[in-house]
Amino acid sequence: MKNKKNFLVIGNPIKHSLSPLLHNYWFHKNKINCEYKKLKTTQAEIKKILTKVRKKEIEGINVTIPFKNSIIRHLDILKGDALKTSSVNTVYLNKKKLVGENTDVYGFSCGVIKKVANRIKTAGIIGAGGVTSSIILALIQKGVKKIYITNRTFSKLKIFKKKFKKIIYPIKWNDRYKLFRDVQILINVTSLGMLGQKDLKFDFSIFDKKINVVDIIYNPENTRFLKDARKNGHKTF
């Protein structure tokens, strides 16, 4: 078929991504002449991929781990929440400029946060990856006043403290159980538990069952993290 428009999601790993299945279903259902593929990518290959976007060989790309931050140096313009988070998951060409946007904030707000926002004032985050700043911004926009965040490499948390100031409370990995007791929602933003990755092991037995537990991983749908939370009586998303 002539003039087919091509779209792509890039990442590493990328096997877990269901984006092509979702997008191609709607393209076919609505008789839109487009195709969406996934590509395992290295940092060195990103510039070459973006050159294809500039040439309109690729109409646009989605970006997943671990490139949501590092791709920014290759772009001309950041818009909306991408400016606030320094995290990009969508790239396209507009007036000969490569534009980076962030739909992660909106997606998380419309999904999980919308269901629990009225009663959430304190949150805990596990992980310091490319989507972390998007989750933080979504929480702030919904009125969360205090966010504890932990990561095995403590130094990686400094960037979030610098960007979001007093609302962020970085905590050392060994202190996570003690300080997370005060949160109302606990969110895993690491890749642990993803298809092909190691599980995230977490002891929920010391936590109040009223704490909502979230895992941003969607493949598999039921991660070890969520299963363990449900065993302890937590509501999971």
Residue positions per predicted region:
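Phosphate/diphosphate ligand-binding glycine-rich loop within oxidoreductases
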Residues: 2-115, 228
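Rossmann-like NAD(P)-binding element
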Residues: 153, 178-199, 214
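Glycine-rich adenosine-cofactor-binding loop
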Residues: 11, 102, 112, 116-144, ...
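Rossmann-fold NAD(P)-binding glycine/threonine-rich loop
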Residues: 203, 211-237
